[in-house]
């Protein structure tokens, strides 16, 4: 599509020189580019939580989940939003035992409540398990997996072990 539409892809830090010129700084140095229109795609990054140190090996973001070399036997998805549920659904179909932990009392809070309930039923039929109204209070990665401590809304604490933890509480 880029070639067909005569679009040049650039990567680096950019700033506007004027309305039709940008200066791009990259590992190759600085260079000015002129055009009638520019598309600026800054991308996004996963929201971090201090108690959950991401290493992209055992505790991963959606980016790391796509780079896993093998299907984990068990996967905990932290966050019941669109990205985490999509990733969880895929890994479940590939053979992973997937559990989703969500701090709220339902998944995908921006979705209509009735539709979200039906969506959750569908995901349960695929084999996903849910821990709603639970929050992760700590994680500890080790050779045999990740130990995850969670607390329910009634302050009961549980600790479980997973091969991989997917941190999916949002992007910024």
Question: What annotation goes with each model-predicted range?
Answer:
Residues 1-78, 149-172:
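FAD-binding core/adjacent interface of flavoenzyme oxidoreductases
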Residues 66-67, 72-76, 82-157:
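Rossmann-like dinucleotide-binding cores of NAD(P)H-dependent redox enzymes
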């Amino acid at each position: 599509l880029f070639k067909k539409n005569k679009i040049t892809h650039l990567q680096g830090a950019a700033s506007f020189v004027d309305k039709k010129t940008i200066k791009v700084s990259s590992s190759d140095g600085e260079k000015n580019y002129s055009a009638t229109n520019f598309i600026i795609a800054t991308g996004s990054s996963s929201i971090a939580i201090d108690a959950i140190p991401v290493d992209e090996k055992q505790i991963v973001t959606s980016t790391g989940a796509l780079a896993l070399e093998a299907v984990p036997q068990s996967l905990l998805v932290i966050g019941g939003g669109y990205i985490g549920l999509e990733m969880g659904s895929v890994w479940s179909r590939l053979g992973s035992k997937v559990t989703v932990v969500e701090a709220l009392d339902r998944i995908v809070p921006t979705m209509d409540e009735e539709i979200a309930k039906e969506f959750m039923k569908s995901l349960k039929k695929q084999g996903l398990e849910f821990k709603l109204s639970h929050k992760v209070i700590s994680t500890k990665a080790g050779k045999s997996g990740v130990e995850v401590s969670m607390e329910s809304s009634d302050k009961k604490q549980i600790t479980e072990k997973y091969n991989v933890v997917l941190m999916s509480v949002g992007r910024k």
